[in-house]
A protein has these predicted regions:
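Extracellular/periplasmic head regions of type IV pilus-like filament subunits
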Residues: 2, 6-114, 118, 128-129, ...
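Low-complexity, Gly/Ser/Thr/Pro-rich intrinsically disordered linker/tail segments
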Residues: 69, 79, 139-159
Length: 159
């Protein structure tokens, strides 16, 4: 769960600066930046003097690999069960209306059981998606924590 909270903080940090110089603040649509760019939440240290929002320790992770036993996917909108109702986070090709993430165990029942979702609202939800969790998580297009998802208390410390 700490990883999804770190994602939330990194997105807030990312959107505090106009990263692409277009005059609009926006959220990152990917975790790893394109090499030589700052278009994701993590980029390798460079001579720009800017530290990536996910910090240097995240650099040990590899795109499409697990991090602390979990895999992650950024969602580009939310469904009717989300606070505020259904809408896209995108305006044109910019993700400026919000953000969300789904995290699921890389190896179900080995690295974890629960899957987690978080949005720009900062609420974390959890659910046991079962052994087919990866397939279900990859099929998700929107942050939509229906009644089958449980809100996690902010002071609950689990991974």
């Amino acid at each position: 769960m700490q990883s999804v909270l770190a994602y939330h903080d990194a997105q807030m940090d990312y959107a505090s600066v106009d990263r692409d110089g277009d005059g609009a603040l926006e959220y990152a649509q990917k975790i790893f930046s394109t090499p030589g760019k700052h278009d994701g939440l993590y980029w390798a240290q460079d001579d720009s003097g800017q530290i990536s929002p996910l910090g240097p320790s995240f650099g040990k992770a590899i795109a499409d690999e697990e991090w602390h036993g979990y895999r992650f996917r950024i969602l580009h909108g939310q469904g009717p069960s989300a606070p505020g109702g259904a809408y896209s986070y995108l305006i044109g090709d910019k993700m400026s209306r919000g953000f969300a993430l789904i995290a699921w165990p890389a190896k179900y029942n080995v690295t974890g059981v629960m899957s987690f979702m978080i949005s720009h609202e900062g609420q974390v939800f959890e659910k046991d998606l079962g052994p087919e969790g990866e397939k279900l998580a990859l099929a998700m297009k929107r942050f939509d924590p229906d009644d089958s998802w449980q809100e996690v208390a902010a002071d609950q410390d689990q991974e």
